[in-house]
């Protein structure tokens, strides 16, 4: 194969002509994934490039060759090799960003109503999972505890509404906006950036890192809220207050021992 290539390139018919060899399949995937990213990051950024911050600091060791520090949130850690395939990495990167955004909104929605309720604001059920479960009650669910606002009695109607509304927004984003001009579905900009946060490339690059760091924390927080709801039947702020009042008796280990057989 190498000999044939050498013979072809040395052919007199090709003399003086530039010959471009096609990239390999992995390179094609990597190129297609990088087309959607505008990289204008300062070489001195601590979050990008080979000298970026690593997951264990100076004890991190050499990161995998495919983790070059090009994308936000890359700390050089990929034990499972999830980023080795360029196409899989591109898909997972988009999924992580989208789930991070939903998790941040969800965590705020779980904590804020309970915080208001604990400070005297009355608007119905404040605990996030109890508020949603009211849809199954005989009287249905009044948004913000006000019957003059949206009154819901059918979980199927809510499900259909969410599918339509969320599907429309996601379709708009993936399709590139009304004119199909958006080149990056993860960071579409335009009408999705009314404050112009992406106008400065260096500031935007740092905001991408902040978004992922907070989004990853929010995903772990939401998982914790789910576990708390199942184990204690209380909201996150009530669980926090119980722990601060009696940390010895109100902690993860104490609740875990309740599930020990024979206890």
UniProtKB/Swiss-Prot annotation:
One of its GO terms (molecular function) is metal ion binding. Belongs to the light-harvesting chlorophyll a/b-binding (LHC) protein family. Chlorophyll b 3 binds at residues 154, 170. The lineage of its organism: Eukaryota, Viridiplantae, Streptophyta, Embryophyta, Tracheophyta. The chain crosses the membrane at residues 97-117, 149-169, 217-237. Keywords: Acetylation, Chlorophyll, Chloroplast, Chromophore, Magnesium, Membrane, Metal-binding, Phosphoprotein, Photosynthesis, Photosystem I, Photosystem II, Plastid, Thylakoid, Transit peptide, Transmembrane, Transmembrane helix. Chlorophyll a 2 binds at residue 99. The LHC complex consists of chlorophyll a-b binding proteins. The keyword DNA damage does not apply. Chlorophyll b 4 binds at residues 162, 173. It is a multi-pass membrane protein. This is Chlorophyll a-b binding protein 3, chloroplastic.
């Amino acid at each position: 194969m190498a000999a044939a290539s050498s013979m072809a390139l040395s052919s007199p018919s090709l003399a003086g002509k530039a010959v471009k060899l096609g990239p390999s399949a992995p390179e094609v995937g990597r190129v297609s994934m990088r087309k959607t990213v505008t990289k204008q990051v300062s070489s001195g950024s601590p979050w990008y490039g080979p000298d970026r911050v690593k997951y264990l600091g100076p004890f991190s060791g050499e990161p995998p060759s495919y983790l070059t520090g090009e994308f936000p949130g890359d700390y050089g850690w990929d034990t499972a090799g999830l980023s080795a395939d360029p196409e899989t990495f591109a898909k997972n990167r988009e999924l992580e960003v989208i789930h991070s955004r939903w998790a941040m909104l969800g965590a705020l929605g779980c904590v804020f109503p309970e915080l208001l309720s604990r400070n005297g604001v009355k608007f119905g059920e404040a605990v996030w999972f109890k508020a949603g479960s009211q849809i199954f009650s005989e009287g249905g669910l009044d948004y913000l505890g006000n019957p003059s606002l949206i009154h819901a009695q059918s979980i199927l109607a809510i499900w259909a509404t969410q599918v339509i509304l969320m599907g429309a927004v996601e379709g708009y984003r993936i399709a590139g906006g009304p004119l199909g001009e958006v080149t990056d579905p993860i960071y579409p900009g335009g009408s999705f950036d009314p404050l112009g946060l992406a106008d400065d490339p260096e500031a935007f690059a740092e905001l991408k890192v902040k978004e992922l760091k907070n989004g990853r924390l929010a995903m772990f927080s939401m998982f914790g809220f789910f576990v708390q709801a199942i184990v204690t039947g209380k909201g996150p702020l009530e669980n926090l207050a119980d722990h601060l009042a009696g940390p010895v008796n109100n902690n993860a280990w104490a609740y875990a021992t309740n599930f020990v057989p024979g206890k």
